[in-house]
Amino acid sequence: MIKLYKRNPDGTQAYHEAWVTEQGVLEHWGVIGEVGEHQQHSFATGLDEAGNLASVLRKARENGFEELPDSALQTLVIEYEEALDDPQQAERRQALAGDLDEFLGWTGLGCCEGSDDGAGTLEVFCRVVDFDIASAAIAAEVENTDCGDFRRIYQLAGVD
């Protein structure tokens, strides 16, 4: 997968990404925080996977989209209080990491890197391109679910 970003004249940040599927290359683009649009491309004859990805993203790069260095990403943490005697609650919350990874990916905001539990809390770790937009989008996404009772969403200091 290749993820590209660009600041628009109106101040919004756009994303343009592509990844290899069984059918070819899936291209996905939009404004961060929104699902955007996508298009499936067939594999080009004579190109390997890297060449196909480069071909699909060529126009985006020509229009100023660039890969972000890892140092440009922020670590967002969603913290839950865990009932230590309720294994089902822990399983539901850990499954949240997979759901958030998909949500963050389809909205161009980033990815979820997993979760950790202990001392009565569960923390879900995400790498995002914009903490403010991602935290608001995540809060809205989980609001009416069994994972809407998070304690807080915060930015992990010292690792970004």
Provide a role label for each language-model segment.
Residues 1-23, 59-62, 83-101:
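Short N-terminal "domain-start" leader segments
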Residues 1-7, 36, 46, 66, ...:
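Negatively charged, low-complexity tracts enriched in Asp/Glu with abundant Ser/Thr
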Residues 14-39, 73, 98-119:
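Short aromatic-glycine-(Arg/Gly/Cys) micro-motifs in beta-strand/loop hairpins
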Residues 34-48, 122-127:
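A short, exposed loop/beta-hairpin motif centered on an aromatic-Gly-Thr core
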Residues 44-62, 135-143:
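A short, charged, amphipathic alpha-helix used as a generic interaction element across diverse proteins
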Residues 66-67, 144-160:
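Conserved short beta-strand edge segments in small beta-sheet-based binding/regulatory domains
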Residues 72-88:
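Short glycine-/aliphatic-rich beta-strand segments at the starts of folded cytosolic domains
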Residues 107-137:
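Short, intrinsically disordered low-complexity segments
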